Amino acid sequence: MAYQLIAVDMDGTLLNSKKEITPRTAAAVTQALARGYHVVMATGRCYRQIAPYMRRFPAMRYAITSSGAAVADCMENRIISSQNIAADTAAGVMRAFVGLDGFPIIFSNGEALYRPELLNDPQRFGMDAYVDNFKANGTAAEEMERSFLATPYPVEKLDFYFTDAAERAKFLARVQGAPAWVVPCESAGVEVNATGVDKGSGLQALCRCLNIPVSAAIAIGDSENDCSMLRDAGLPLAMGNAIDDVKAASEYVMPDCDHDGVAEAIERFLLAQR
């Protein structure tokens, strides 16, 4: 099988531990794009939040955003596939959060809405690495939860970051059985998407749009929310810093995010093809 596309998770995969793209990785991505391969960011971030990274690669056209809820054509600045959480389901999940020590984020129409208090003490919620991106590409919303619960609307995704894993466990217990897909992320975070929506469904939707068999796609990641696209891709790859479930779902383990794992994957499995 000749591979035509690689879907690349961002945090802990494309980005190193400093949230940077290394020179070798940038060069490999640029070379793959120049040779006509699709290099696709597959991320939990919304469309607006990936804009600074997309600008690094003018030839990069597509992105899987909000953990598969929205697939974007970045050159035409439009969403080509979207699957939102229903308003009543999103409201129920938000109500389950009320009273817990955490930080909610609403992803809607390519935007990330957050409470401005995030900027006061981001380290408390494990969000310090994301502050600059939120300042530049997020939308601060006063009394966000109260406003949303008063007038719910469909959303791409809900994220919650808690002070610790114990507080996250309380939330997970409350939303057990909710008609949504609830996936833990990072050390004390949770992502919520519509049922059936994940990075794997986003990858399938993009492949259909491009008329590419999903078996011709490579996927690489490090976290639990990457497992779905690894299961669907023709070649699943794990980063060296990946959790055990990701490594178990992969055919090969690349170096970690601080040692150019994505660059090696592109060089070895795309650029080396004849």
Enumerate the language-model features and the residues they cover.
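Mg2+-dependent phosphoryl-transfer enzymes with acidic/Ser/Thr/Gly-rich catalytic loops
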Residues: 1-5, 16, 21-23, 190-274
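Active-site phosphate-binding/coordination module
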Residues: 20-128
